[in-house]
Amino acid sequence: MEAALSHKISGADKFQLLLDRHIRLNQPTGNIIQLSIEVKGRIELEELRKVVNANSFLTQLNSLQVTDNTLSIPRWINGEEQYPVSLTEFPYKSAKVSEGLIDIALFQDVTNTKVLILVHHVLADNMGIQQIARLIDGTIKPPLLPLTEGVKDTTPLIQQLVHTLKATLLVFRKTPKHMAKLVAAEVVTKTFILDFDDKQTILIEENAAKNGARLSRSAFYLAAVSMALKQTIFAGNGDSFFLPVPQNQRLRGNDQLAMGNHLSFLFYNIPFNKLNNLSEATAFITAQMVEQIKDQSPKSYSYLLKTFRFLPLWLYDFFFKMPTKGAVCSFLFSDVGETLPDMKTFMGKEIVEVLNLPPNPCPPHITFVMMKHAGTLKLIMTYNSKAISEDEISKFEIALDTLLIE
């Protein structure tokens, strides 16, 4: 662990700190990601507490802090105090109950146990939180990889600056003039899950191919979500969607735990007039994806995030809100893919279900995660019920279900 105690945070980590700042304007819980694991049988709270407290690395990880010095790049440092990971039983008072970066909540029903792992997003991305679960379970052992880029960047400075400029121009070019966005003064977070069975999953994946998503099914999923939103929740709201979609920057085959956010982004401007049918929408989104990948846009955006690490949050905030005139995006969407292949048991018990729950949705009031576990697809939506009505959610579910499975 010692090697991680004075690492500069990554550019994507700094971006998560910015989102945390926005979220805390409306509610105290901040930028939290959650992983829900349901197992067959009972896991007792004290049994889990004993396992967690015996793992000194988890305590160190939970107690890390980020420095926030003006005009210097924030760093991960060891906290002055060591906080054991907080464990509690449902119902818990809030989505973040302790001083540390990790919390665990437990829920028992008659036959099964649900374990909810809550982690500050600056510490982990969706892959990272799954690996924290494996660390708790003992599937993997410390020491673990650093909390920032593991490979030294040898790209010349002038090339890094060129990439930064390219990314800046890309964001301004992609941002629509009349972006659809949701507005609400209050925040009441709710979660909605569309859980597809084996047959539905096969049908959806076949439909993705039929509609032209041969390079990436994510384009089809995003097209379907965008069309359903246009027809329901965003009906009459703006004329185009704008959103960043995370792209995993971890090295393929790297099964070790690397904390922090190893992400860049692809940016999509999706005019409503391109959302007339699934084939057209999928082709339009795929074309933007291919163009940006060929142009190395994710790499360029990584350098932009890296360059902006030294900025104080208020100035960083200004730069990122300027292209969108104050809004972050229309909605957030991530396709996190299949859960880790060895997530079949937890604490010696068979896993029934795993859910990568979306982070706090504010901003922009609505967030989607598409994922797959044990061969079946799930779409998880976290939304602000003060910005979106239950009637709109019901209509959205019907529209999306029809688009995906028709």
Identify what each model region corresponds to.
Residues 45-47, 52, 261-337:
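Helical lid/core segments from catalytic subdomains that handle acyl or acyl-like groups
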